[in-house]
Amino acid sequence: MRLQNDLISELFYMKINGIGVTSPDQEMNMMNQGIVRIGGDVFGAFDDEVITALTNTQDLIGAVLRIHFCLEEFLNIWCNKVTDNKDFFDFGFIGFDKKIKIAVKLGLPENLSIIFKLFNSIRNKYAHDTSAKITIEQLNDIRIKIDSLPNFGSQPIPKCDDPLFETPVGDKILSWNGINISTKDRIVFLYFVFSMKILGAYVAEFHKRGISFNYVR
């Protein structure tokens, strides 16, 4: 079941296929299909090298750190846009947890912030103990909260554990209950679905505030 959620879904679908490290023939095929690539104001959160490394890594810790980096960029984007700053956090190091609090003070929806915190707690666990385990209970908690987020397109994003919900990530086809799916693949799958819902929420929230927002290259 291919993701369908208007233009946002199309962008997401292409991005998780590793667009950004394409051959000239693949780029031409995209152009012929009228497909655009994620960029603009959210380029930092969809950095080609980071996303490509995330889709291809077999290392759980590496995946967690890259997801954390991308989520931090989403927080930066929120704070930059709502304050009309090019770099809101240009005054020195601010930890991820404090960035969440600042973003919430600046209007970031609470339902998004809760999921940011859950991903951050996993990252922090690894930061203090590289032998730490991510439990299925932790992942299910994130999954349920992602599924509860609103959809902003004409066709809703399926529930993460919908048996028909499959999506390509790198050279794999992932589904929540896929045969032999690893913890690393599950957390990557959750992140990509969450990033799609973040993007949809940002489009809606910035439009409501009359803030210009460009998410294509």
Where on the chain are the PLM-derived regions?
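Amphipathic alpha-helical interface elements
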Residues: R2-S121, K125-R217
